[in-house]
Curated annotation (Swiss-Prot):
Species this chain originates from: Korarchaeum cryptofilum (strain OPF8)
Chief place where the protein resides: membrane
A Pfam family hit: BacA
Similarity comment: Belongs to the UppP family.
Catalytic activity line of the entry: di-trans,octa-cis-undecaprenyl diphosphate + H2O = di-trans,octa-cis-undecaprenyl phosphate + phosphate + H(+)
GO MF assignments: undecaprenyl-diphosphatase activity
Gene Ontology BP, a term: peptidoglycan metabolic process
Keyword Metal-binding in annotation: no
Documented EC number(s): 3.6.1.27
Annotated protein name in UniProt: Undecaprenyl-diphosphatase
Function: Catalyzes the dephosphorylation of undecaprenyl diphosphate (UPP).
Compartment(s): Cell membrane
Amino acid sequence: MEIAQALILGIVQGLTEWLPISSSGHLVLLQIILLSRSSAAFIALVHAGTLLAVIVAFRRDVFNVIKSFLEGISELPKGSAFSSPERKLPLYILIGTVPVAVLGLALAKYVDEIFGSSKIVGVGLLITAALLYSTKWAGGERPLDLRRALIVGLAQSIAIFPGISRSGATISTALLSGLKREEAIRYSFLLSIPALTGFLILELIVSPAHEILNPEGLVGLLSSFITGLIAIKFLLSIIRRGRLHLFSYYCVIVGIAILSLL
């Protein structure tokens, strides 16, 4: 892989991981167009860049979640460990992560078939479009609870399939479940951290060290980190203005084009 290709793939990963248009789908398409399949190590590094982006963007929330979890653990003997909403959030994140972990392990041996199909990408983008468009009618003031945490976690699990946007699926589902807009945003982004961390660890385990420590990988990591931060800031402004559905038009156009041409 050349530096220019690494830069392009890193930028695409950074933008599409957080914009609700499916990073996996766009990476699959780019690899088809460039006739170059990225190594597991490179994929891991660009995901590391987007993971760092969300941790930096939500650093206060990440700190508070860790703090609440540790405080809850320390008060287990008292019987009031996870009674407050702040203390419950770490548990909701763990519970919401279970579906994607289970489905990911179940589909592990089918990775090549799933990620080698442009038709799956096209269908996935149309599903993403439907979810995003439906948010035109979403709205609520309900707090996060166990049921909604699990529902959003299930939505995250289907984003394993290329073409289905993780951020699009989780934020749309959270809004449709009646969650307050800010709570839907916060939970969706915090929920992504364990999933991305798990994926990153699995990819690094099977990656030779020499494939990780190279200029192309560093370019991919830095470009995905920088563009990831930009994408998160842009997406937050769109959601807060109630215009998440606008991304559905792009997903429909690209999804139909893929199914028609590839």
